[in-house]
């Protein structure tokens, strides 16, 4: 099974998941930078610039990051578990979630074991690199 979906020599093209989330609480804090529309633009620009194709948006609007029982997230997670997604990209780690233990389990154990790369643009984290994988625990602690 292919584990990445960049344009270079890919035989089997896996989906690059572009995940967006906006909490009800976020609505009043920084509407412009955290809006779903803005997140989609940032994610699509990054994916295009870095050569990721076959992108698909997964969106949770008005859902807290303290739970992973979110419709868009669950759909993405099911596709990950079925081997359809090779990369997950988020604008920043807080968009992915705010629950430290589950975030760590997914980004440091589950995704690497399934060959899925996790990228957070703002924190410049890419778990396909040794440094990116090593930095994830520190970022998860900072999100508390």
Role assignments for model-derived ranges:
Residues 1-144:
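Short, structured surface patches at the beginning of a domain
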């Amino acid at each position: 099974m292919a584990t990445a979906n960049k344009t270079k020599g890919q035989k089997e093209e896996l989906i690059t998941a572009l995940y967006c989330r906006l909490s009800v609480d976020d609505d009043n804090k920084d509407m412009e930078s955290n809006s779903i529309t803005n997140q989609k633009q940032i994610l699509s620009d990054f994916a295009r610039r870095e050569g990721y194709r076959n992108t698909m948006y997964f969106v949770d609007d008005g859902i807290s990051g303290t739970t992973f029982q979110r419709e868009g997230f669950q759909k993405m997670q099911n596709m990950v578990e079925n081997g359809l997604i090779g990369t997950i990209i988020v604008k920043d780690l807080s968009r992915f979630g705010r629950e430290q233990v589950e975030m760590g389990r997914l980004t440091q154990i589950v995704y690497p074991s399934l060959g899925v790369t996790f990228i957070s643009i703002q924190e410049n984290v890419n778990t396909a690199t040794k440094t990116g994988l090593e930095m994830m625990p520190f970022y998860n602690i900072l999100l508390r």
